[in-house]
């Protein structure tokens, strides 16, 4: 009986084992078939005669999203998409460095509220963009970076300029994808663009390999051998390559939706808004601090301005919110922010973050009631419970929140004494600036005085791009944006080199504006070559270079603290002549023509209005205006 039972058990085991093995084999075969796209190929066709290419799909999606410009430095990996964009009426603007292309896309994104687009070639082309992409991430700017790549089959096999680009950009971007089939271009780009603009905006990266962008006949020529090998293994390899080729192009030209996907923008709840209304209604000395997020869509700048004016609370404007109220608005307080924050009993941080710009929250009075609004939860609570504590923290869109807050406070009035106190302190501080403008300097021109002349010269339609350290930081105190979205600086990352790219993007998307660039001489070194770009593309901008022959923002603290100016010295370079060599117009200001400063600025303005890119090289000396402002 035992022998019979054992035999029966063994007899049942082997069929079960064979069934399991067969099932495993079938599953493996089906998995391989799925990965090779064999099932999809059964239901869809490959058009082997088509001369269309993936670049056309890229261009179609960009056009459907209202993209007007693509910034680039050309490379063979991305040529099809550039040619396709040009054919669809999207202006392709080529720069002299890839980082400039991304900075230009960043400027377009900030000024238009839509996605800005840059396209660069593989490997070094992409690595050259890293600083600009990180700057866009920190500034929360929706930039789409399109990057070329080696063919899908040649990745990780030593192809030219082939690196792991995805690992490089994942820490920098909200969304990263590598397109592996032509049919995936459209849905991938739609998803990427929606991700860039949803929630907290930021950069996204889409990798487009060579064989996804080029037409079938070109890819076939490179991928499939013309002569069929005799060996079995050789024939298997050819079959595999033919299948890979088919999977790349199967269903490539079937109609697909190309337009924008819905955006996910967080909103404050009615209960949160009501609690904030109650807090602010009890304030005696309220203060509003607006940051860049306040200018994000969907709330237009004019509606936000009307809301701030209706609210009637004194405010400080930072980042992209600079200029929201125009010049000399009675509610806009420009000086002594730390002192004002210490005195306020209720502070609304609307898009402002408690990072180094607000001394990590230490400038806030612990007895004040703090309302903070931000789309990003990390920014919302940054350094809270260390140096400050919010009474109400609202994760939501800042502009929409401000509209609802004002609606809830209709009829609320505050004593004019508080605003008048802040304005008086403002006026006293600005008088000290006027006094410093009259102080002599050892050589050349007083930069404070020069910037005062610039402030008086700027037209109402000026759009300011600022790129530098000491000269630009001084300008931030003295030069006022003429309106909303009329001031472009790098943002919290403090990146040097944004100037040319920002100016390029700004002038193209706002051609009616006069784009004035304020450069430090150190920062100008990054942008000089792009005057070739301005000339070639007929983009007239005017650059004012505060030339004090050094990295003065660093030296003003390094020298007294460490006793050396090592690596801080530059030369009084003839930047205006270098620009002239690139086809731009060049002017110079120094002590020799001090009495003609305004005249020369007007001359540069007229040249710019006549269609020229202009560099005004302003030789300046050094003052104690920013002593103590160590840059770490």
Swiss-Prot record:
CDD domains: TPP_BZL_OCoD_HPCL, TPP_PYR_POX_like
Protein localization: Endoplasmic reticulum membrane
Pfam families: TPP_enzyme_C (PF02775), TPP_enzyme_M (PF00205), TPP_enzyme_N (PF02776)
Keyword Flavoprotein annotated: no
Gene Ontology MF annotations: lyase activity; magnesium ion binding; thiamine pyrophosphate binding
Keywords: Endoplasmic reticulum, Fatty acid metabolism, Lipid metabolism, Lyase, Magnesium, Membrane, Metal-binding, Phosphoprotein, Thiamine pyrophosphate, Transmembrane, Transmembrane helix
Cellular component GO terms held in the UniProt record: endoplasmic reticulum membrane
UniProt topology in membrane: Single-pass membrane protein
EC top class named in words: lyase
Annotated TM spans: 13-33
Catalysed reaction equations from the record: 2-hydroxyoctadecanoyl-CoA = heptadecanal + formyl-CoA; (2R)-hydroxyhexadecanoyl-CoA = pentadecanal + formyl-CoA
Matches recorded under PANTHER family: 2-HYDROXYACYL-COA LYASE 2, THIAMINE PYROPHOSPHATE ENZYMES
Name of the protein this chain belongs to: 2-hydroxyacyl-CoA lyase 2
Gene this chain is encoded by: Ilvbl
């Amino acid at each position: 009986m035992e022998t019979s039972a054992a035999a029966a058990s063994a007899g049942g085991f082997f069929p079960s084992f064979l069934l399991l093995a067969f099932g495993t084999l079938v599953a493996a075969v089906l998995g391989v078939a799925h990965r090779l796209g064999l099932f999809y190929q059964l239901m869809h066709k490959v058009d082997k005669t088509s001369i269309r290419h993936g670049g056309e799909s890229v261009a179609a999606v960009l056009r459907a999203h209202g993209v007007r410009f693509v910034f680039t430095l050309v490379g063979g990996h991305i040529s099809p998409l550039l040619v396709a964009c040009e054919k669809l009426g999207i202006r392709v603007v080529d720069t002299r460095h890839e980082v400039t292309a991304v900075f230009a896309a960043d400027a377009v994104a900030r000024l238009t509220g839509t996605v800005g687009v840059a396209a660069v070639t593989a490997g070094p082309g992409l690595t050259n963009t890293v600083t600009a992409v990180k700057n866009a991430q920190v500034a929360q700017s929706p930039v789409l970076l399109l990057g070329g790549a080696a063919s899908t089959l040649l990745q990780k096999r030593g192809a030219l300029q082939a690196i792991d680009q995805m690992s490089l950009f994942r820490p920098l971007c909200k969304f990263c994808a590598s397109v592996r089939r032509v049919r995936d271009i459209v849905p991938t780009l739609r998803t990427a663009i929606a991700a860039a603009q949803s929630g907290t905006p930021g950069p996204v990266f889409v990798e487009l390999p060579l064989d996804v962008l080029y037409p079938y006949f070109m890819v076939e020529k490179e991928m499939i051998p013309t002569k069929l090998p005799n060996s079995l293994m050789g024939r298997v390899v050819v079959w595999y390559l033919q299948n890979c080729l088919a999977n790349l192009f199967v269903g490539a030209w079937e109609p697909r939706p190309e337009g924008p996907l819905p955006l996910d923008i967080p909103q404050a709840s009615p209960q949160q808004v009501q609690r904030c209304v109650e807090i602010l209604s009890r304030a005696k000395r309220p203060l509003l601090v607006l940051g860049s997020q306040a200018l994000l869509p969907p709330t237009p700048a004019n509606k936000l301005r009307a809301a701030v004016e209706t609210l009637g609370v004194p405010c400080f404007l930072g980042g992209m919110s600079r200029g929201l109220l125009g010049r000399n608005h009675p509610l806009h307080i420009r000086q002594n922010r730390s002192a004002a924050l210490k005195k306020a009993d209720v502070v609304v941080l609307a898009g402002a973050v408690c990072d180094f710009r607000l001394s990590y929250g230490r400038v806030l009075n612990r007895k004040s009631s703090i309302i903070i609004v931000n789309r990003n939860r990390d920014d919302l609570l940054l350094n809270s419970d260390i140096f400050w504590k919010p009474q109400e923290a609202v994760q939501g869109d800042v502009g929409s929140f401000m509209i609802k807050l004002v609606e809830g406070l209709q009829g609320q009035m505050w004593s004019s004494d508080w605003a008048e106190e802040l304005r008086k302190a403002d006026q006293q501080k600005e008088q000290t600036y006027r006094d410093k403008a009259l102080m002599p300097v050892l050589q050349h021109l007083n930069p404070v005085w020069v910037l005062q002349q610039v402030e008086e010269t700027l037209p109402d339609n000026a759009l300011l791009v600022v790129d530098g350290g000491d000269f630009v930081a001084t300008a931030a105190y003295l030069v006022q944006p003429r309106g909303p979205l009329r001031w472009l600086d790098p943002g919290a990352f403090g990146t040097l080199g944004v100037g040319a790219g920002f100016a390029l993007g700004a002038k193209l998307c706002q051609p009616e504006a006069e784009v004035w660039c304020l450069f430090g001489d150190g920062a100008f070194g990054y942008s000089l070559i792009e005057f070739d770009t301005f000339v070639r593309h007929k983009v007239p901008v005017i650059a004012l270079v505060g030339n004090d022959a050094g990295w003065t923002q660093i030296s003003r603290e390094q020298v007294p603290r460490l006793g050396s100016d090592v690596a801080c010295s530059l030369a009084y370079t003839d930047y205006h002549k270098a620009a002239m060599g690139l086809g731009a117009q060049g002017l110079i200001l120094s002590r020799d023509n001090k009495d003609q400063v305004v005249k020369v600025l007007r001359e540069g303005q007229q040249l710019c209005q006549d269609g020229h890119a202009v560099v005004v090289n302003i030789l300046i000396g050094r003052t104690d205006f920013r002593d103590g402002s160590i840059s770490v």
